[in-house]
Amino acid sequence: MVERIQKAGHAKHSDVERVLRDTPRHEFVPDADLAVAYDPWQAVVTHRFEDGRSLSCASAPWLVAAMLDQLDVQPGNRILEIGVGTGYNASLLAQLTGRADLVTTIDVDPDVTAKASQALAAAGYGDVHVITGDGGLGYPDHAPYDRMIATVSPWDIPAQWWKQLAPGETAGRPVAVPCQVSLLSFSRPGWR
C-alpha cells in the first residue's frame, strides 16, 4: 500500500511513511476484508444513516498520506482533528506527535466516537482525547493547537478554528479536505 502511495507522490515525509507502515489499518476497519482495508485508493465507509447515506469513513490511504504530508506534524505538536472517522488518522497523528494525549479528535455522532475510542484503546492510543461534539466549534479546552485537520467536508474555515490555532511565527497550520476529494491548505494572514 505505502509503495503504491509513494509512487503516486504521497507519503513524502519519512515519518508519514513510517507510521503508515507501522499501523495496522485493518484493525480500524474490522468489517472490511484485507484487500479493501489496504487498497490505497479506496475509502471504507464505516457508518451510515438509516437511509443508506454514508456518515463516516476511513479516508483512502493516499488521501491520508497527502493530508499528513501537508500537515507536517512535528514531535510535541498539539493537534485537533475534526471528524473522528475510525480513529485510524488519530492513531497516526499520535505517533507523529509522539504523545497520544496531545491529539484531540471530535465528531458529532456518539456512535462514531464510541467505536473510534474502542479502536484507539485496543491499538494502544487510549490517551487520544475523543470528544463527542460539534467540530465546527473546534474544541477550545485543549487549545491552542499547532496543527488542525478537518477530515470532514467543511464549506469554509469557521472563525472558532482560527481562534484556536497557536499564534505567532510558528502559527498553527490547518488542513481541510472538502468532499474528501481534493486537498486544500489554508494559512492565516501573516503565516508563511
Model-assigned labels for residue ranges:
Residues 183-192:
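Class I S-adenosyl-L-methionine
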Residues 50-52, 162, 179-181:
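Short C-terminal domain-edge/linker segments immediately following a structured domain
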Residues 39, 172, 187:
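Residues in well-ordered beta-strands of folded domains
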Residues 41, 62, 155, 161-162, ...:
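A residue-identity detector for tryptophan
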Residues 69-172, 176-178:
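Conserved nucleotide-cofactor-binding alpha/beta core module
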